[in-house]
């Protein structure tokens, strides 16, 4: 029996039977049924029997009978233009019918169809830079991404939204923060939970990211849930953000500073307009139009990040011989076992730039307080202040390829990576 999206159906394959609403599928070879629980299930059409229980039980967005390409939002001269750049990740994911796992396979146009709430907020241009899960991110893709952002801004984009997997989003946001001088907002967003889950955060994050991209904050930032509720998203500076929870929707935090601002979802969900809705900005920020577009995307890939722990074998550091740079996550103020000092000194003598950060995250490195720290400074270690370890790695990759004096650059606040004063601890 023929069934259309929106029909309530019972699908039987083998000994299994599923009942729910048929929804549009990205493949003609598979059916997607939304169960009453809110989850989606994918079924191979080759061995499935379909019974229509209620025709047109619900209205399904995008069910026009036309090819998917016909769902593109029409251009409106009164609206800003936002470039949507997809790199993959959960926000652009669906069910892998081979395994039942979630796989990233939507391109930017699919995101528009999947999030109809984006319609009317802006004109959109979509492009795919990569289609990967973010654990497969590479520095070369950061360079491709920076080039794509530059091209979109040069073509007239009023803002850019980058769809990205959350696991390594902080690294990519840091990379573009160092690579780009941008006159418009560049907003990273993603989803902790895929679209087939009732608790998915993809729609709210995407809507808030587009509103942020229409705002006056011309920086690279991350837009994700600020709380577990669907109330507002936080805007985190790309060099001060860190994913601090594996699965919560509010997994991202600004560390050692306060967020650039917030996007109120209720306000953003009201009738779409050309102006940014629901965006409040807190503190100093680069304003739209202040900077002239420039890209410095060269990177030195031979940089390692090493976390010191008690009992760490000296061979782990010795294995970094030949690397252009090493960032160490030290304890407290920036310490390692005193037995490692000579190995670190040998790395420096051989031309490796060694940078010290703290695994404490809050506070800053100061190797002038204790003997161990002073010995590290004498060995040539560069203090990175309160730069986050992951950010320090990306910054060192960038500094070694672009700065006249990389060591000095690591002690300067490029793109807000290093604050001038750590926040006092408050309960």
From Swiss-Prot:
Catalytic residues as annotated in Swiss-Prot or TrEMBL: 90, 166-167, 243
Catalytic function, reaction form: L-glutamyl-tRNA(Gln) + L-glutamine + ATP + H2O = L-glutaminyl-tRNA(Gln) + L-glutamate + ADP + phosphate + H(+)
Domain of life of the organism encoding this protein: Archaea
Cross-referenced Pfam families: Asparaginase (PF00710), Asparaginase_C (PF17763), GatD_N (PF18195)
Keyword set, alphabetical order: ATP-binding, Ligase, Nucleotide-binding, Protein biosynthesis
EC number: 6.3.5.-
Protein name as it appears in the record: Glutamyl-tRNA(Gln) amidotransferase subunit D
Record organism: Halobacterium salinarum (strain ATCC 700922 / JCM 11081 / NRC-1)
Highest classification ranks of the organism: Archaea, Methanobacteriati, Methanobacteriota, Stenosarchaea group, Halobacteria
């Amino acid at each position: 029996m023929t069934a259309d999206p929106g029909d309530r159906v019972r699908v039987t394959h083998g000994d299994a039977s599923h009942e729910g609403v048929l929804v549009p599928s990205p493949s003609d070879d598979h059916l997607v049924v939304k169960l009453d629980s809110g989850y989606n299930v994918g079924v191979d059409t080759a061995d499935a029997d379909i019974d229509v229980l209620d025709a047109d039980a619900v209205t399904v967005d995008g069910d026009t009978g036309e090819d998917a390409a016909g769902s593109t939002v029409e251009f409106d001269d009164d609206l800003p233009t936002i470039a949507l750049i997809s790199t993959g990740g959960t926000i652009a994911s669906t069910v892998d019918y081979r395994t039942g796992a979630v796989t990233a396979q939507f391109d930017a146009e699919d995101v528009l169809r999947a999030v109809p709430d984006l319609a009317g907020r802006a004109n959109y241009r979509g492009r795919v830079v990569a289609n990967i899960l973010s654990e497969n991110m590479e520095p070369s893709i950061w360079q491709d991404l920076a080039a794509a952002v530059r091209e979109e801004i040069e073509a007239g984009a009023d803002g850019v939204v980058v769809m990205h997997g959350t696991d390594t989003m902080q690294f990519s946001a840091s990379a573009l923060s160092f690579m780009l001088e941008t006159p418009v907002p560049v907003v990273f967003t993603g989803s902790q939970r895929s679209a087939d889950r009732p608790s998915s955060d993809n729609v709210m994050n995407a809507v808030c990211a587009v509103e942020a991209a229409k705002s006056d904050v011309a920086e690279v930032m991350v837009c994700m849930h600020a709380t577990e509720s669907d109330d507002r998203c936080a805007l985190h500076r790309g060099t001060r953000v860190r994913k601090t929870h594996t699965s919560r929707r509010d997994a991202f935090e600004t560390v050692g500073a306060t967020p650039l601002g917030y996007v109120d979802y209720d306000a953003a969900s009201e009738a779409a307009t050309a102006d940014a809705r629901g965006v409040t900005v807190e503190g100093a920020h680069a304003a739209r139009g202040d900077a002239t577009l420039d890209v410095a995307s060269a990177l030195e890939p031979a940089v390692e990040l090493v976390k010191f722990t008690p009992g760490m074998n000296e061979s782990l550091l010795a294995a970094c011989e030949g690397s252009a740079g090493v960032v160490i996550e030290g304890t407290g103020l920036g310490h390692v076992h005193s037995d490692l000092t000579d190995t670190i000194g040998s790395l420096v003598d051989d031309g490796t730039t060694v940078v010290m950060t703290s695994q404490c995250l809050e506070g800053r490195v100061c190797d002038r307080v204790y003997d161990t720290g002073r010995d590290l400074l004498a060995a040539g270690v560069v203090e990175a202040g309160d730069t986050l370890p992951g950010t320090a790695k990306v910054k060192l990759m960038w500094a070694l390829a672009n700065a006249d004096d990389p060591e000095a650059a690591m002690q300067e606040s490029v793109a807000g990576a290093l604050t001038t004063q750590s926040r006092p601890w408050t309960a």
